[in-house]
Design a protein with these regions (language model features):
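Conserved ABC ATPase "signature" region
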Residues: 1-18, 66-69
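Helical segment within the ABC ATPase nucleotide-binding domain
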Residues: 62-74
């Protein structure tokens, strides 16, 4: 039963070509896909991902992103993503929570967050708000 489930997880994540490799020999991105596979094996429906894009090449990041989106849509997984890559956040997250100094600064859609003055000021400085207002 476990072997059958593992085979399904490996297929879902397109990792069949790596089944003979030791985890220690995998690249950073491949290890992150393997971590997703581990969550699938225990059927963890709520998953915390910390800097999923860090140290991962764009090709593997696309594979990881697609796997996260599929797990959310097809298997009803919920992901909490801690990430600084805003492009990645825009692809993965329906709701974005921005924190500053340990407190929630703003919560909303990606588009709402990226245009929120408090967020812009906290992360880019007041000059960016003035520049954005001049360009509007």
């Amino acid at each position: 039963e476990i072997r059958f489930k593992a085979t399904k997880v490996i297929d879902f994540l397109n990792l069949t070509h790596l089944t003979q490799e030791l985890a220690g020999n995998l690249s950073g991105g491949q290890k992150k896909l393997l971590e997703l596979g581990r969550t699938m094996m225990v059927d963890a429906k709520i998953v915390l991902l910390d800097e999923v894009g860090a140290g991962v090449n764009r090709t593997l990041l696309k594979d990881i992103s697609e796997a996260i989106i599929r797990l959310n849509k097809e298997k009803n997984y919920t992901f909490f993503v801690i990430e600084h890559d805003m492009e990645l956040i825009s692809k993965l997250c329906e709701t974005v929570i921005v924190m500053a100094e340990g407190s929630v600064l703003y919560q909303g859609s990606f588009d709402e967050v990226k245009s929120n003055e408090a967020v812009i000021e906290a992360y880019l400085g007041r000059g960016m708000i003035q520049k954005n207002n001049l360009n509007s």
